[in-house]
Amino acid sequence: MALFTRSNPAPTTDQAKTAADIVDPPVARPTIAAPARPSIVAPPPPTDRQNQLTQLKVKLHQQLVERLDMQNLRTLPAETVRREVRELIRELCRSEKGLISSSEQERLMDEVMDETFGLGPLESLLKDPTVSDIMVNRWDRVYVERKGRIELSDVTFRDNTHLRQIIDRIVGMVGRRIDETQPMCDARLSDGSRVNAIIPPLALDGPAMSIRRFGTKPLQLEDLIRLGAFPAAVMDFLAAAVQARCNIIISGGTGSGKTTLLNCLSRYIPADERVITIEDAAELQLQQPHVVRLETRPNNIEGRGEVTQRDLVKNCLRMRPDRIIIGECRGGETLDMLQAMNTGHEGSMTTIHANSTRDAMARLEVMIMMSGYEIPVKAMRQMISSAVNIVIQANRLTGGRRKVTRVSEITGMEGDQLCMQDLFAFEQSGVDENGMAVGRFVCNGMRPRCADRIEHRGIRLPSDLFMRRVIET
């Protein structure tokens, strides 16, 4: 007999209370002046010479495609290809009757190479190690994030058609498609960078694209300490919790560093454990030898063949995993993940979108409802209470600085309510002269229930780790 009945009705009155049990009355607030709108200086319009070089680049690219055996070139070493293309470009440039200087010729060669074998104008940004995000709003508006701050770059595409060609090239590399019938697509680059693209009719100003980059060398928890994400005391506890096979959920907003933190925590999974990762677009970088990576698949052109995260969670339970890591829970797979945590797959981890550790619990309830099963609220909360041990909140603060702002533990149930206690928290006191958030980390003096579990695994924690205090960073 099935434990739950399958249905798709609207949530009951009892279920509708899960997001917030109490609604506060409106409170009069003082009027606050809107902050000054930052001015973004658009790049200057191209000069006649720049337009001439752009037209020449297009012409050279077309001639290269006509004269080179592209299929054969892709199998040759990069240096051999570069040498052959260099000679051909020089030959083509000579036909321009000396109108191109040697420096312009070198630059044209690099740009034509990028256009032919790379991702066109994006190549210069992808080679820049300081760029963490690339946001293409339209063909002539490309923004980047450097050190937490967003700025307008001088990179542009020729037009919407050129941008669409690059998008098609990216999604084609991972066997996906984007067109009017499927105008949104997730993909990844060869270096693991995550790509999301959207085209008209959904994107009103032309194709748009976002690229989340990941360093070639995965960050470690020690790197996050150096960057000020959290102090060493928090790292000691989180590393011990992973080794002791606590189930962990990382909560946060877009760009708050959830995936980076998940990658860092995975470093402490013992090498002899079998780990299965499940993602929509593969971006986790686990370093253990015994890892199986699974990725979802969208429908094909006939509208069939979709494989969802929920399908993969159900399948991976037959693959004898010690731990399951889901890149991000968004829907009904949350129920399957919690059931796996409750049935012997301890030490599993995932991320979700929420604004606080307590909001994360409400989000879990909502996503359980999305599974299509009619489960009483109390049963959902009991499931969460028995499955999840630690909830970590990551935030992108004022000025772009990313921090772990709270580490909480689920302590059980009191009546129908889920109970949590905060172990560590970041208290923001303001901003510095550079507009960056400043504050202090505090330990709330609560000894976690999982501390005994950690010690039973033979892991020794500092005696003063959970003492109530301000933590030095």
Question: For each of these PLM feature ranges, what is it?
Answer:
Residues 1-151:
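N-terminal anchoring/assembly modules that precede and organize ATP-driven motor systems
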Residues 250:
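Hydrophobic anchor at the beta1->P-loop junction of P-loop NTPases
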Residues 215-226, 263, 267-314, 360-364:
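P-loop NTPase switch/communication element
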Residues 258:
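Conserved lysine of the Walker
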Residues 403-473:
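NTP-binding/hydrolysis catalytic cores, primarily Walker-type P-loop NTPases
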Residues 128, 136, 141-244, 462:
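P-loop NTP-binding catalytic core
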Residues 279-292, 316-413:
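Conserved P-loop NTPase nucleotide-binding/switch module
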Residues 72-75, 95-102, 117-128, 170-187, ...:
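Active-site phosphate-binding and catalytic loops of NTP-dependent enzymes
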